[in-house]
Amino acid sequence: FLISTIYLLIVMSMEHTINLFDFQQYWKKLLGFLFGILIISAFCVVDDIKTIKPITKLTGQLIGAIIVAASGIRIEGITLPFINLPEIHEITSVLLTIAWIVIVTNAINLMDGLDGLSSGIAVISAISLMVIFVLNGSALISVVLITALAGALVGFLPFNFTPAKTFLGDTGSNFLGFS
C-alpha cells in the first residue's frame, strides 16, 4: 500500500508532463501490441506443453512483430552518440522494428536459464522505461502499463530467485522480451 501511495503521489506531481488525454490516438497501437502478444503467447503455450521446432516458434515471433509494426509501433529514428538518424525510411523502419522485437524477445528467452536473471533485467528495463515515459510526456496508458509490468515482476522475483519455486517458461520469457 505504501509503495502504491508513493507511486501515485509521484505520478500526480508529474501530471503536467504526462499526456493524460490521448488514449484515442493510441488505441490502434495498443490493440496491435495486445494481438501480437496473443499470437506469441499461443505459440509459446504450445511450446511449453509440447516442444515445437525453433523455426515454428520464430514464425510466431515474426507474425507477432509484423502485427505490432503494422499497428504503427515503429522505430522511427535512431539517435546515438555517433549515429544520428532522426528520420528513417518507412520500409527500413518496419524491418528494423520487426528485427528488434524478435532479437530482444529471443535474448530475454535465452537469459531465462538462470534463476531471476531475465526477470531482474526486465524489472530494471521497465523502471528505466517508466522514467523515460514520464520525462518525455508519454501517454498515461504507457506509464500505467509499464508500471504494472514492473510491479508484477517485483512481486514475482522473490519466487524466482535461487532456489526458484516458480519459473517463467517460454510463454513468460517471450512475453517479457516482446514487451
Model-predicted segments: where are they?
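"…together with the soluble PPM/PP2C metallo-phosphatase catalytic core" -> "…together
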Residues: 1-179
